[in-house]
């Protein structure tokens, strides 16, 4: 299955605790917890461009599977890392955070971020 498409956040679990652990200020956590972000993924072979729009904030990362890339994190920090693909999963380690994005079916994208024992899970549905 191709990741290409636009996905809108439907539900999330563990947002507040996870964002506190990564050092996001309380006011930003409060503003962000109810915003339904939109993720747009463009897949062309092993090349990906991921754009996440949350309110007025737009975060865009481009990478090639298996090659080092400069990725911007949720907190605005830039990290050199490698994104790997395992079937319908994209896996990347950003400092202490492990992110797994899985296309569980043609219309559902699940992003699970893990930091120590904390888990932040985002479930998005395809809108285009």
Swiss-Prot record:
Annotated protein name in UniProt: Fatty acid binding protein 1-B.1
Additional remark text: The zebrafish genome contains duplicated fabp1b genes (fabp1b.1 and fabp1b.2) which probably arose from a tandem gene duplication event.
UniProtKB keywords: Cytoplasm, Lipid-binding, Transport
Family, as annotated: Belongs to the calycin superfamily. Fatty-acid binding protein (FABP) family.
Major location (coarse): cytoplasm
Gene from which the chain derives: fabp1b.1
Expressing tissues: Expressed in the yolk syncytial layer (YSL) and subsequently in the intestinal bulb in developing embryos and larvae. In adults, expressed in the intestine.
Domain of life: Eukaryota
Alphabetical list of Gene3D superfamilies matching this protein: 2.40.128.20
PANTHER family the record matches: FATTY ACID BINDING PROTEIN
Free-text comment on this protein's domains from its UniProt entry: Forms a beta-barrel structure that accommodates hydrophobic ligands in its interior.
Subcellular location per the Swiss-Prot or TrEMBL entry: Cytoplasm
GO annotation, cellular component aspect: cytosol; nucleus
Pfam families documented for this protein: Lipocalin_7 (PF14651)
Biological function: Binds free fatty acids and their coenzyme A derivatives, bilirubin, and some other small molecules in the cytoplasm. May be involved in intracellular lipid transport.
GO molecular function ontology, one term from the record: fatty acid binding
């Amino acid at each position: 299955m191709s990741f290409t498409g636009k996905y809108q956040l439907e539900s999330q679990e563990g947002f507040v605790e996870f964002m506190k652990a990564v050092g996001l200020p309380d006011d930003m956590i409060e503003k962000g917890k109810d915003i339904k972000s939109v993720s747009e993924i463009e897949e062309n072979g092993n090349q990906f461009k991921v754009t996440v729009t949350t309110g007025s904030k737009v975060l865009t990362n481009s990478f090639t599977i298996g090659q080092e890339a400069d990725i911007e994190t949720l907190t605005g920090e830039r990290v050199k890392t490698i994104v790997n693909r395992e079937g319908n999963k994209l896996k990347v380690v950003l400092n202490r955070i492990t992110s797994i994005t899985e296309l569980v079916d043609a219309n559902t994208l699940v992003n699970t971020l893990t930091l120590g024992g904390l888990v932040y899970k985002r479930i998005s549905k395809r809108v285009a």
